[in-house]
């Protein structure tokens, strides 16, 4: 049954690979409505230069997460455009887009696998040395090595064997390993 469900967001028939990017992000007159017409964002204009950091703050339910989810096309805009280096994200393949954008979600997702494989998910061809370096950068390496099975420790379904902070750091290590040109941290403590 699940395999027959069509995704809500699909590549355009003429979608092309996103070329290597500098990382300029533009939201041009962006509005977004959820199904049923619930408006969340109206006429947003943002320009984020490569290397620039932007913090979006506001109350819960104010649309911050939705704003973050438009860039990697977890949702499509209702009006306007979201562009990387002047290229509308709707005109490129989702796979090429998501290779250059890394997202640290509020809700960390871990697989029922080892710590090593959960970090490796950021870049499946990574070596063990690269995985360990990413963990050091995320300041979780010492904690991992202190576990009885180290990097081969099984984390359980959705990481139930780990604390919330450990899950967050593993997710950060995954992003360091991926090393995307554009990084979205949808979590204040990140």
Where are these predicted regions, by residue range?
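ABC-type nucleotide-binding domain
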Residues: 4, 9-11, 16-190
């Amino acid at each position: 049954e699940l395999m027959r469900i069509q995704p809500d967001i699909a590549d355009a028939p003429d979608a092309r690979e996103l070329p290597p990017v500098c990382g300029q992000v533009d939201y041009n007159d962006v509005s977004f409505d959820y199904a049923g017409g619930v408006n969340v964002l109206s006429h947003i204009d943002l320009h984020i230069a490569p290397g620039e950091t932007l913090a979006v703050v506001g109350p819960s339910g104010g649309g911050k997460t939705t704003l973050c989810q438009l860039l990697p096309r977890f949702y499509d805009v209702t009006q306007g455009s979201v562009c990387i280096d002047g290229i509308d994200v709707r005109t490129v393949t989702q796979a090429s887009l998501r290779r250059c954008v890394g997202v640290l979600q509020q809700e960390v997702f871990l697989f029922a696998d080892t710590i090593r494989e959960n970090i490796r998910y950021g870049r499946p061809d990574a070596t063990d040395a690269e995985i360990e370096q990413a963990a050091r950068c995320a300041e979780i390496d010492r904690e991992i090595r202190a576990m009885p099975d180290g990097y081969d420790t099984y984390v359980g379904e959705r990481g139930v064997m780990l604390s919330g902070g450990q899950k967050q750091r593993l997710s950060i290590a995954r992003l360091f390993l991926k090393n995307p040109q554009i990084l979205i941290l949808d979590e204040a403590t990140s």
